[in-house]
């Protein structure tokens, strides 16, 4: 039995989570097809994935982070036994505290699932211009799609957090994300070349009768600006157990999908903080956009878009 097979067997015997075969093959194919040379891994476990990545080419360099001291120590030994200590640098630290300035062609997130969004937001700044971020375990053994498979409260809470992360990926206008049915579910996110960082400004003065009424009803009104150009005005408010978003004005019709995603990302945190899991969007008929599934939205017969968090 070779070194990598022994590592895999050790992980199985000791219930140490490692990437499933199909998921690992997908990531390795991505590394080869995209010519990735520098890889950052969040969650080393015992070094199984990092070793597989480094074995793809002598030109591949891997930096990997593991918080658990026992797994870190085992990974150090495994990397050394495979003769890869010069190309795999492992750090024993909480990834959220790690200070890394390098840029990477591929970032692989496979650590604490409850922290996925924080990992994504922190390390997206370490992504090269044409790099990709891959996240594993988005199906969580089928329980994300079918939560009735478990009655454990802690597991149910984790499933909700994974669902929120998937929602975050689908809505995030800064990245184009595809989720693949590989292994336990993996996402691949690439920078969106059309993305412009938006600004949000509260509308405090009624510019017209419609906005005046929205303010009178107690709705929060915001404008979205991209490069100092207003692209839309929207209101949002809570109604029973869901949020309602109403687009008042849309200036950049050619960017309607990104404008909607920007707005959803802005409102999403308020919804989650309020314990809201459903957002209803009212969009004028003439502005209905094509990227419904990509933005995680469902269209209903009454002309409303639904987004589940």
Predicted segments, located by residue:
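Conserved short alpha-helix immediately C-terminal to the canonical SAM/SAH-binding motif I
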Residues: 70-74, 263, 287-288
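Conserved beta-strand in the GNAT
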Residues: 223, 229-237, 244-247
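Short amphipathic alpha-helix that is part of the acyltransferase structural core
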Residues: 8-11, 194-216
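Conserved GNAT acetyl-CoA-binding A-motif
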Residues: 271-284
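Conserved acetyl-CoA-binding loop-helix of GNAT-fold acetyltransferases
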Residues: 256-269
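Conserved acetyl-CoA binding element of GNAT-fold acetyltransferases
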Residues: 241-253, 303
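Conserved active-site alpha-helix within GNAT-family acetyltransferase domains
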Residues: 284-302
